[in-house]
Structures are given as structure tokens and as C-alpha cells.
Amino acid sequence: QQHYGFSPFAFSICFAVNAVAIGVAATISVKFRQLETGTLTGCIGMLCLSVCVMIALYNGCGFWTYELLMFALLFTMGLTFTSSTTLAMDSERRYAGAASALLGALCFASGGIVSPLVGLGNILVSTGVTFVVCAICSLLCALWAMRKVPMKVAMCRIFR
């Protein structure tokens, strides 16, 4: 908001537009024949677009470039919301309530961890790097959950 010189009201309009991207993608994600495909597509899209956002922010992109990339990034993120939650709840139906609580707590904990990280150093660069790291973690977790990559391999890739 401050970097691009927008008022709080103008920037809240941008948030609303981005929220539409998430909502539309969440609606579309149920159209995939397999829920895993929606999650994997979203995670791969998040990684690709996070790298684009990081490069754009590093190069001091204009607002419209930033907004278009964020809209696309949040769209791909929205693809993962419905399918990943459904897959998590379906994996252990007996413990769906506990799984839901853990997912909610994980989201809040992740937000608490990430929030101070984006303020380190140059806020544009740290934000871009944080997006990429979170996208990598999301993709590795999705691959591990789908059993396409053993947990040991996924963890090694995260901490490499």
C-alpha cells in the first residue's frame, strides 16, 4: 500500500478483487475429475507464479504488473483450498473434527511465522522470497500427501 502510494480504501479494493480470484478458483477446483489434480495444479501454479512475483518485485515492477501476478497467484492458491481440505477430511473420516482444527491452527501459525519475515530487509524482496519458499513447501506437502514423494525426500528438499 505504502510502496505504491494507495490509500487504505483503494488498497482494500485490490484485496477484494484478489478475494474474487480465490473464490472463483475454489469454485472451479471441484470441476477437476480428481481432487488431487486440483491440488497439484494449484501448487505447481503457485510455485511458477511465486517465482514470477519474486522477480517482478525484485525489479521494482509497477502496480498493475504486481496486481496481475498476484491475481493469478491467488487464483492458483484458491485451486488448492477446497480440494486440499476435502482430501484432508476424507483421509481420516473418524477424526475429521481434529483434522479440521489442526488445519485451522496450522494456517494461523503459518501466518504468524510468515508475517514478520516479509518485513525483513527490503520488503519487496523478502515478500517475493517468502512467497517462493511457501509455494515450495506447499508443493512438497502436496506431493507427500499424494504419496508421489516419500516424506524423507520431501523434507530433504525443503531443508536443502
Give the residues covered by each predicted segment.
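A late C-terminal transmembrane helix in Major Facilitator Superfamily
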Residues: F75, L87-I123, T130-F131
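Residue-level signature of the transmembrane alpha-helical core
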Residues: A16, V20, I44-L47, F71, ...
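Transmembrane alpha-helices of Major Facilitator/SLC transporters
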Residues: F11-F32
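Intrinsic disorder in cytosolic terminal tails and internal cytosolic loops
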Residues: L143-R160
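Short amphipathic helix-loop junctions that connect adjacent transmembrane helices
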Residues: Q1-F9
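Interfacial helix-cap and linker-helix signal at transmembrane-aqueous boundaries
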Residues: Q1, F32-R33, L117-V125
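Symmetry-related core transmembrane helices of the 12-TM Major Facilitator Superfamily/SLC fold
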Residues: G128-W144
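C-terminal transmembrane helical hairpin of 12-TM major facilitator-type secondary transporters
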Residues: T39-S83
